[in-house]
Amino acid sequence: ECTEETLKGLGFDQMSQEESIAVCEKIFSKYLDGHRLMSNAKHLRGSAMWLNFRRISCQKWSFGNVVLLGDAAHTAHFSIGSGTKLAFEDAIDLADELHLGKPLEQALKDYEDLRRVEVLKLQSSARNSTEWFENVERYLDFEPIQFAYSLLTRSQRVSHENLRLRDKNWLEGVETWFAGKATQ
């Protein structure tokens, strides 16, 4: 993720993939410790490597006996890593609805009604995460612990108390840090 200003200012929109990677290697050299950056976008050329995420939310997920699943019906920004999860859950719920022996039209309607709620929840989290990354400049002056906390809770899928379940000691350190800041 980067802002339009950064994309154009560094010339990424005009560079080849190799040139773009070379610039990023220079920018992040002190963190790469001599290692090279890798790209999984071998098939992309030029500015296509720098994609604007396309949010898809189809009004209807089926037509006749053709059914859309996953990203074909609804996308969730890749920053929350749930695209495959949504597709598999769609497939499972569709199979369950079809297995109940309902008329096809009713099974497809019930599948869509059931899945749409879960999809909207994840799309909302994905939107929050996307906005965090699109506005990352506002967090760059945070101290590392505050930046990490903000990053971990950006989608609102991971709450303060959920962090406690995941890493109690780390969160207690965050709370101590925040309390110290509040009393300065």
Per-segment meaning from a language model:
Residues 12, 28-31, 53, 63, ...:
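Phenylalanine-focused residue identity feature
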Residues 1-51:
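Conserved FAD/dinucleotide-binding core of flavoprotein oxidoreductases
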Residues 18, 61, 81, 182-184:
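Polar low-complexity intrinsically disordered regions
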Residues 47-128, 132:
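Conserved mid-domain beta->alpha element of the FAD-binding
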